Regions:
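Structural preference for beta-strand elements that scaffold enzyme active sites
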Residues: 23-25, 111-113, 138-142, 196-199, ...
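Substrate-binding cleft of secreted/luminal carbohydrate-active enzymes
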Residues: 230-244
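Active-site-proximal helices and loops of the catalytic beta/alpha 8
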Residues: 18, 32, 37, 44, ...
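A structural motif
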Residues: 109, 159, 231-232
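Substrate-binding/active-site clefts of carbohydrate-active enzymes
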Residues: 1-101, 105-106, 128-134, 151
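The substrate-binding groove and active-site-proximal loops of carbohydrate-active enzymes
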Residues: 1-7, 78-93, 110-119, 168-174, ...
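Conserved, mostly hydrophobic/aromatic
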Residues: 17, 27, 96, 103, ...
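Carbohydrate-interacting/catalytic domains
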Residues: 181, 241-429
Length: 429
């Protein structure tokens, strides 16, 4: 894939990431192939004489596909450009597992995001997990699963994590509809497995959150909840600048723009034939860019302003412009990294209304308390503490503002501005 550069430059990129404490997870499409895949091309050329007749599901030479093939086959959700692989065939499983071995040995990747994991056989996933444990014990397997009971996929025999689409839907509608009850219900329902799930507010298949929110001011409480509720929070590239984008009819182009790096860096990324690989040629991996999709320059002036993905690509504004939203997400990421309670801590609901929501994540004799307000008006809350404390106040880890604790009621008095949230560190005893 030329978008990743050459084998040498991609290995250099992975090595640089490891030097900076960053792990690299690549996308693996093991459910289906394209029509240009060697096995499918051979099947087209040799029909029932091809050694790959059993590589695909339900190959039938009694009828032809809508794309003019002289045979039929099972396609992914009726998309004939994507013929489905037959994972019951040991040759297919061996080929896919050898592919994983290659990417680990050649590039030292740290994990795979399994595309369409909900369509893969459990037997294949279990075999993949055994291989991962064998070749790299800390190798991370995350699956794209949209519907179903996530615990069926997330367990010691299967995957480490799957996409939490339930939270994705409830976290934005909780703000659009002023209904934190929906979000809290999903958190409680997924409590057992929730801390292992991959949480997000937008991705390459879903409209940008800046386009989905009816009120841009909700970006602040929404992202605060993303980083403090159970789960593994993620940011889709460009959304840290408030980029907008909606999925078009049979097109994801607006969701996957090319973000231009600052001009000097862009020049460093040019190959000898003028192609932008998205990877620096000097071995410095501190910055890189996507090399596909329409050009945009990301930037916003306030936390509540957003940037359209159809911005004129000839403007002088470059990617990487620091905005209040960018700074907030940086701060939230730093808080999440520094607080063990936010990694695997037990969840406890403390206060819930349609427009205000407070909960704690428990650590070792301490807790992180988050309170959010989706109303345009300020809210004055009396939030019960998760345990008794001798402290007289608690400090917001985002702003440094302090809030008083009432020793008589064991409640903390929190004044929340409209469309805001706080994260408080509280010590037990």
């Amino acid at each position: 894939d030329r978008r990743l550069g050459t084998n040498v430059s991609f290995r250099s990129f992975v090595d640089c990431c490891h030097e900076h404490g960053i792990r690299v997870v690549v996308d693996g499409v093991f459910n289906h192939t394209g029509r240009e895949f060697f096995a499918f091309r051979d099947l087209q050329a040799h029909r029932d004489q091809s050694p790959y007749t059993r590589w695909y599901r339900n190959v039938n030479f009694d009828w032809g596909s809508p794309l003019g093939d002289s045979f039929g086959y099972e396609s992914w959700h009726g998309i004939w450009e994507l013929p489905c692989l037959n994972h019951r065939n040991p040759e297919v499983r061996d080929y896919l597992l050898d592919t994983v071995r290659f990417w680990v040995q050649e590039f030292d990747i740290d994990g795979i995001r399994l595309d369409c994991a909900g369509d893969l056989s459990f037997e294949f996933i279990q075999e993949l997990r055994r291989l991962a444990n064998e070749i790299k014990p800390e190798f991370w397997l995350m699956g794209e699963v949209i519907h179903g009971e996530y615990a069926r996929w997330v367990n010691p025999q299967m995957l480490h994590s799957v996409t939490n689409y339930e939270m994705h839907k409830s976290i934005y509608s909780a703000h659009n509809d002023h209904n934190y009850f929906e979000l809290a219900h999903n958190v409680r329902r997924l409590e057992v497995v929730g801390r292992e799930l991959y949480t997000f507010v937008d991705n390459h298949d879903e409209d940008r959150i800046a386009s989905k929110l009816l009120n841009p001011a909700h970006l602040a409480p929404l992202y605060t909840l993303l980083f403090t509720l159970p789960g593994i929070p993620s940011i889709y590239y460009g959304s840290e600048w408030g980029i907008q984008g909606r999925r078009g009819h049979n097109s994801d182009t607006e969701l996957r723009p090319r973000i231009l790096p600052p001009r000097p860096l862009a020049e460093e990324m040019q190959t000898s034939d003028g192609q932008n690989t998205g990877i620096r040629t000097d071995g410095n991996c501190q910055s890189f860019s996507s090399a596909t999709g329409p050009n945009i320059h990301a930037g916003a002036n306030t936390c509540c302003q957003t940037t359209s993905s159809t911005t004129d690509s000839n403007t002088d504004t470059s990617a990487g412009t620091v905005t209040p939203l960018t700074l907030l997400i940086q701060k939230l990421a730093a808080i999440h990294a520094a607080e063990p309670a936010l990694h695997g801590g037990r969840y406890q609901e403390l206060l819930l209304t349609n427009r205000q929501y407070a909960f704690a994540r428990h650590g070792d004799h301490q807790a992180i308390l988050t309170a959010a307000n989706n109303d345009d008006n300020a809210a004055y809350l009396q939030v019960p503490l998760p345990f008794h404390t001798t402290a007289e106040q608690a400090t917001d880890l985002i702003t440094g503002k302090s809030f008083l604790i009432d020793k008589n009621t064991n409640k903390i008095q929190i004044e929340l501005e409209g469309n805001s949230a706080v994260i408080l560190g509280i010590t037990e005893g």
